[in-house]
Amino acid sequence: AHFATTLEMLKTFEWEERKGKYLLRREPVGVCGLITPWNWPINQISCKVAPALAAGCTMVLKPSEVAPVNGIILAEVLHAAGVPAGVFNLVNGDGPNVGEAMSSHPDIHMMSFTGSTRAGVLVAKAAADTVKRVAQELGGKSANIVLEDADLEKAVSGGVSQIFTNSGQSCNAPTRMLVPQASHAQALEIAKKAAASAKP
């Protein structure tokens, strides 16, 4: 859905807009630093690289040091597709060294980071001295709020099922379930049963 939405938006996006006697022109932000997490690696990488390319930005990608292969393969694919040298750049390494160097580098104009809140704070602090834009998707593990009029069996068992998707490694897994106090005991039994029947 990310790519379909991006492609659809690009078809009608107004790069220039006349407002009275003024012309508003939207231009690429410049070099984008992209730091991606270990879970859903090719999806996370693509969701940062595709919009940057579409906007006309060059980029430096640092994939997670524990899941670097997808970034390497994408670099090979982009090279084979004829993306000019220097448009897509790949660096491997850890956050404290490579991530910090990217975030603080004066020639990187925007940082896009997906990962932990702890690391996000470090990215924002490192980027502050150069006053670059910072876009972050932090933390994860979403709340699953079940209201009084919900079908409790369906909501709880469905929520438990979603927790185990992608081996439980999804940042949007609804792992914090909030139910009405009066339904707590019943919800707990449904959750136990659903978890016990989950298939690896």
Where are these regions (language model features)?
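N-terminal Rossmann NAD(P)-binding subdomain characteristic of aldehyde/semialdehyde dehydrogenases
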Residues: A1-V49, V83, F88
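Conserved residues at the C-terminal ends of beta-strands
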Residues: M9, I35, D94, T114, ...
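A structured beta-alpha segment of the ubiquitous adenosine-cofactor-binding alpha/beta core
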Residues: Y22, N89-S112
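General beta-strand structural signal in soluble alpha/beta enzymes
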Residues: L61, L90-N92, F113-G115, V134-L138
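Active-site pre-lysine segment of PLP-dependent enzymes
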Residues: G71-A80, G95-P106, R118-D129, I145-D149
